[in-house]
Amino acid sequence: MKAIKEFLGYLIGGILFVGLIPSIMWFFSGKPSLFPSNTLRIIVGAILVAIGLATSVWSIVYMRYKGNGNPMDAFGHEIAPRTVHLMTDGPYRLSRNPMLTGTFIYLSGICVWLLTWQSFLIFVLFIAIMLVQVRTEEKRLQRDFGEEYEIYRNHVGRFLPLTLFKHKD
């Protein structure tokens, strides 16, 4: 049962973040060409997409093997087995939410490709929803890991590794 739950967590996450959100952005952007003539836009968008996907995949793989769990936890509801160890190294030494940081970079690449206000609006809406999700997740991490999480939270930014941009609650 745990293996099925874990598989479903990865499947749902992949479909949602890599497929559904970009498809919604494309659909509501008036369905522009997927291969616009602006070469620079294609290159910049592709670089952002690649960096974002690589960051997210690194974080997911790291969580699976180091944290012994799965990232799919939605608004306090366990969709797949939760991690049993707090991860503070690897990609998690740079950001408390490197999967989302990668997803934000990936979706910004999609926005560059589409270059429409609709895709940007959907991107901003997605960020707002994820901020609510992250706050819910942080409460759970505080409950599960206590002082260890508190120390980690005070030293690592929510999304960005730069102390200047670190969000302190």
Question: Which residues does each PLM region occupy?
Answer:
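Membrane-anchoring alpha-helices and their flanking helix-loop junctions
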Residues: 1-89, 101-169
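Histidine-centered phosphotransfer motif of kinases
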Residues: 94-101
